Amino acid sequence: MMRIGLFLLTNLAVLVVAGIILSLFGVGSYHGAGGLNLGNLLVICFVFGMVGSLISLLMSKWMAKKTTGTEIIDPNAPRNQAEAWLLQTVAELSQRAGIQMPEVGIFPSYQSNAFATGWNKNDALVSVSTGLMERMNKDELRAVLAHEIGHVANGDMVTLALIQGVVNAFVMFFARVVGDFIDRNVFGRQDGEAPGMGYFAITIVLDIVFGILASAIVMWFSRHREYRADEAGARLAGKQAMISALLRLQAESEMPDQMPKEMKAFAIAEGKEQGFSLAALFQTHPSIEQRVAALQQLNCP
């Protein structure tokens, strides 16, 4: 579940860069003597928004490895029984889920956590923390792996990219509409005059502000997909094992979160936040209680 935080951070960076390029080199295609050409602007923003989101998606696996320090297990030469068991279990779950074997890795973290990412379901990465390996029994660990395989099989990252691309398009569109309004009514730009530096500065700031606010839509999808991944984990590894794994994660919820901020939404668990906490609209996960309650209603062994 760390996958979305990384995706959002990368996407925001790409969105800002795309916005700068659009403002500097594309302004003439939607800004004329009569003001904004809203049709042209919407098309251009849609193209830039989708491209930015797809770049984030394509970079997600590489950035996940670098950000978490994930070390990939050589499928032909596991170094110990634990690594061999991980490879065997992921291979079995992947086959049952109907996807190709993903890369399997381990990242250093005392906190029990895991994530899956990748640009498509047949080119994915599943990684677990050292803390997860040390403190969960095999049934619980298998359930966590099944949960992550569920994310991959459900195509969550691709769906996220499509949602984020549409969100990006509207963020860039409204940033430029509002920026044009401010440039005319606050900075006094007259009809026929080219946008000045004030317009460019405003649109870049609005890209960031609107991008953060619009992430609430993506966070809603993140919360929704956790239930689906929990269900997949329960069907692949057993409902009680999935519930047991979640309850163990809940027992560690008072631990400070060691996951890099940009990876939190990719993780299966979030530790206790230190200091200010964002509103519920920006939470990447439902509560453990909500997830367990949903699993208990599930009709499966």
Swiss-Prot record:
Instruction: Report the active site residues.
Output: E148
Q: Which GO terms describe its cellular component?
A: plasma membrane
Q: Name one Pfam family in it.
A: Peptidase_M48
Q: Where in the cell is it found?
A: Cell inner membrane
For biological process, the GO terms are:
proteolysis
Its EC number(s): 3.4.24.-
Q: Which residues bind Zn(2+)?
A: H147, H151, E226
Q: What is the enzyme's main class? A: hydrolase
Looking up Gene3D superfamilies in the UniProt record yields: Metalloproteases ('zincins'), catalytic domain
**Which cofactor does this sequence's record say it needs?**
Zn(2+)
Task: Please list every transmembrane segment annotated in the UniProt record, as residue ranges.
Answer: 4-24, 38-58, 155-175, 200-220
Could you say which protein family the record assigns here? Belongs to the peptidase M48B family.
- Recorded protein name is Protease HtpX
